[in-house]
Amino acid sequence: MPKVALYNNEGSQVGEITLDDSIFATDINETLMHEAVNMHLASKRRGTASAKTRSEVRGGGRKPWRQKGTGRARHGSIRSPIWVGGGISFAPKPRDYSYKMPKKAKRKAIKSALTTKLNNGEIVILEELTMEAPKTKKIIEMLENLSINHKAMIVTGASDLNVYRSTRNIPGVSSALANNLNVYDVLNHDYLVLTKDAVSVIEEVFC
């Protein structure tokens, strides 16, 4: 089982924590991670693109000129897709792009993502993170103490409104709940800052 340093808010090591092999030291499946990222991005698509086909465009019910004898190309409607102002061929319509992966595949993908982060030294674990009030400055100082100056996601075990409000105004920094982790957010941030409680929740939920 991998052992990782445990830090306080001042950036000092206060101990070590042993992580679960089945989550933080599993075989990495890049295919499943790729599929999980695609699933997440697909679910975020608005799917509101819409255009009219030739049957929906106003007008065009009368044949513009007779079939033969004019010397001009034959046409049956001025709303054909080849006419200016005509309908759109294969016009897009509002649709839902979201889909779901099997639960086992989704769980394997998040384990692969967490293992990748740990192997790259991009997981930092805090003994605790308590905030009596929203304080952006405190989060910035904590990240500086931990030598984190890239995109980071702070993961807590339970909902903490003060942490959320303290991170939302820092560019490149976000917060999340341990039981709501997804592969896209894990891989899209350079560092994961996990509280000790968050590790316990992750090992319980994704085991």
Curated annotation (Swiss-Prot):
Keywords: Ribonucleoprotein, Ribosomal protein, RNA-binding, rRNA-binding. Coiled coil: none annotated. Residues 44-76 are annotated as: Disordered. InterPro entries: Ribosomal_uL4, Ribosomal_uL4-like, Ribosomal_uL4_dom_sf. GO terms for biological process: translation. GO terms for cellular component: ribonucleoprotein complex; ribosome. Residues 60-76 have a biased composition (Basic residues). One of its GO terms (molecular function) is structural constituent of ribosome. One of the primary rRNA binding proteins, this protein initially binds near the 5'-end of the 23S rRNA. It is important during the early stages of 50S assembly. It makes multiple contacts with different domains of the 23S rRNA in the assembled 50S subunit and ribosome. Part of the 50S ribosomal subunit. Belongs to the universal ribosomal protein uL4 family. PANTHER family: 50S RIBOSOMAL PROTEIN L4, LARGE RIBOSOMAL SUBUNIT PROTEIN UL4M. This is Large ribosomal subunit protein uL4. It comes from Natranaerobius thermophilus (strain ATCC BAA-1301 / DSM 18059 / JW/NM-WN-LF). The lineage of its organism: Bacteria, Bacillati, Bacillota, Clostridia, Natranaerobiales.
